[in-house]
Amino acid sequence: LTSSNCLANEIYVNQIGDSITTTINQDGENNQIEGLSGSGNAQLSGNNKTVTFNQTGDNNQTRVWTNGGNQQMSLTQDGNSNLSKMDNHGDNNNMSVDIDGDSNFTHTEIGNGGDNDNNMSITIDGDNNAIYSEVISGDSNNVDIQIHKQDNSYAYVRVNGNSNNVKAWQGKHEDGNIDTDETGDNEVYWIVTGDSNNLASYQTDDNGNGGQHIANYITGDSNTVKHTQRGSGDHDGFIAIDGDSNDVELSQRGNSSNEQFADIEIDGDGHTVDVYQRYADHTANINLTNAGGAYTLDLEQTSYSAKTYSMTGTCTNSSGCGITVTQN
């Protein structure tokens, strides 16, 4: 199904069946592929489907609900002020969203019935974009969010499940390259419930025009959390964890003209926490509450500027807890 060179067209889809290939192309403005509370259908059910949505222009909308296994789903929007929503239910699905433009809103979701082994990839290029990505309930899912060439962007990630791998990038590509035209004022928020998840947040601003903010809220055990901020702007990092045996690494790197602030609060046993702050003015507040197993803290602050930290901990382990602080 293809429509091209058009304005204000609406497409309603209600598809049921297996092994189906569907492609929808829209070129113009104010076009809609309806569904998910925008009214209309845009529902696809069945296994082994390949579904592709392409929209070029401004003020377009794609809203789709899918159900099935082994699906290949792709959504691309090129333009400004577009909206996209993709809600997936099922196992072993691949979801890909690629947005190029400014002031766009995208929401991707892995279903609410214990959906497992899905791959979700979201790539955004542009300014003033908002991204919501959710694993409502499921295990062993992979989520990768990359936001390039931007300022004033917002990413919200929610995960409920175990053994998920989640990465969010702002200003840094997965291959390690850094955007030279990325100006900061970006935010990432995580809310994670579950065990044995691997979670990584990366932010880079290269021109020093704005700051970066990351906040991680985690409930569960044996999670690995990596939080990295670098560049010329101010950095704020916040991590709150309720659970046992979590591994936390927070790294901030700037220059002599900006500020870095880290706040880590962990309630549970047997955590390993590494905090690294380099250059700029540093402040680190760390609160570790412990009811049994020992925790380990390694804090390093390197700078010619101000360096301050506060440490609050409760350690009931008979062998003690390990704390190392280096300032130079």
For the regions a language model picked out, list residue spans one by one.
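Low-complexity repeat regions of mature extracellularly deployed or surface/particle-associated proteins
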Residues: 8-328
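Gram-negative bacterial Sec-dependent N-terminal signal peptides
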Residues: 1-8
